[in-house]
Amino acid sequence: AEDFAIGGKQLHKKGDVICKMTTDSTGHADTGNAQMYVGAKYTLAETKAAEGYAINSDSKTFEFKFTGNSVSYSKLNIDVGNDSQKGKISVYKSGDAFTGVTAMGSAISVDENGEIMESGQTTYKPVFTECALSGAVFQVTATEDIVTADGTVHAKAGDVVAEIMTDENGYGETEPLYLGRYEVREIKAPFGYVMNSEPKYAELIYAGQEFEVRDTVDIEFENEYQRVMIRLSKTMENDELFGIGSNGEYKNVRFGLFAAEDITAANGTSIPAGGLISEISLEEDMSAQFDTALPFGKYYVQEIATDEHYVLNGEKYLVTFEYMGQDIQTVDIDCGEFENIIKRGRIEGHKTDDKSEPL
């Protein structure tokens, strides 16, 4: 109440609480037998909201007006609305990205004559670092009927209520949603990545009447960069007469994986065209595979060492590693078969006399 007096008699002092009301099941409440006077000013303020709702902080000031001598009391209807509390769901998306290149130099030594010897080639290693990912799209689905305290059904179980796309910082957020349980599932992976098909769950619960929108519920997802498996097989000529081909000669064979073009990382470093990335040896079954993590680009496979009895195969097998879509975890590339042939020589004889004259 505000200060109010009649004929010098103080009937209300400012701040007096005239009455407290609680709404019934129909949402109505009245002042009952509280004494209130025509001409006096009163303020109606909500002190406790219904469960699931944010308190209405807007108070309403009113005054009873004289309505004639035939009316014993005045009646005033005041509507006070409440908003159902809501919440937001945010996602953060991360994954390994091609951020740099590390160059590992050749081994350097000094021989017995003081000459500097260099062993092998410089190897370029792609560096992948976990980073925020943009462009991932998520679908938010109600896992139960979403019903507010007044009985209104805002979504049925299974209804899609929102879609989220991550920004350049890897974050995405829904609009305010009604309280309840939800499933968050990735439906589109960022370019270059494998979709994470595992759903995650979020529950927006009542956080008290002071909040119209409760704190955001955060969920994190991670994507794997699409990988590549580069396979090859080997055949080596066999010569039983000279015992070549059955004495583990394959153990001396090595293949290299090289960049066929400049491949540049996010930080500006690059693998130069012709740069060696990885070396492998043959398995006992004469097969080999490169499974190192690679950025998308063009490469070639080449034999770089073989047994001393064989001719080095100089053939280059070109490999293009392209993104094959979000449903493929590893791209399988078969380079086919590389063949080694035995080194052959020719012996020629010339017959001469004791004066070296041909006969």
Label each region the model flagged.
Residues A1-L359:
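Solvent-exposed loop/turn and edge beta-strand elements of beta-rich ligand-binding domains
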